[in-house]
Each structure stands twice: as C-alpha cells, then as structure tokens.
A protein has these predicted regions:
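Short acidic-hydrophobic surface loop/beta-edge motif
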Residues: 1-8
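Short hydrophobic-aromatic micro-motifs
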Residues: 10-12
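Short, surface-exposed, charged amphipathic helix/loop patches that serve as local interaction elements
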Residues: 14-91
Length: 91
C-alpha cells in the first residue's frame, strides 16, 4: 500500500482484513481517549507494522523531525483504518 503524505510517499506493508479489524478496535479506543502517550505508542506500533521492523522504520523515518514523523505515522494509521479526518498528535 502506498501512503501519500506532505513529506513524500511511503510504501507500507499490506495487512489482512482480520488484522485491520483487530487494530481498528485499538485505534478507536486510543483516539477516543486523546491520550498522547498511548497515541505515540500506537504510532510506534504502526511504524513497525508498516515498515517491517524498527531498523527499517528508523531508516525510512529517521530524517524527519519528531513532529513530521508523528504526522506521517498518523497518516499511515488513518490509511490502514480508512479514516479520512486526521487527529493532530504532533507537538
């Protein structure tokens, strides 16, 4: 899956419908709480899901600032979940 962001395009691993449904439950709960610590943990989980492992995620996202990385990862989460309105988790 290709995800377009204002920082470029990112090729992300595909997931199954079952995996997407399981993650959707988690994403909904975290979005509802607006807990930034949980949101950052979720973003880290999706970075590994999208890119395969921590090293690949670091290679791909390592040149971004923390806020830019948050924006990219939130866009990736929303793309996986089919959510159109992003939630701002930066800064």
């Amino acid at each position: 899956m290709i995800v377009d962001t204002k920082y470029g395009q990112y090729e992300c691993n595909d997931i199954t419908r079952k995996k997407r449904r399981d993650l959707y439950k988690k994403v909904k709960k975290i979005y509802a709480t607006e807990d930034m610590e949980k949101m950052h943990d979720l973003a880290d989980e999706f970075a590994i899901l999208a890119f395969g492992d921590e090293k690949k995620a670091n290679d791909i996202l390592g040149k971004l600032t923390a806020i830019e990385e948050d924006e990219v990862l939130l866009t990736i989460i929303n793309a996986y979940m089919g959510i159109e309105t992003p939630l701002d988790i930066g800064g």
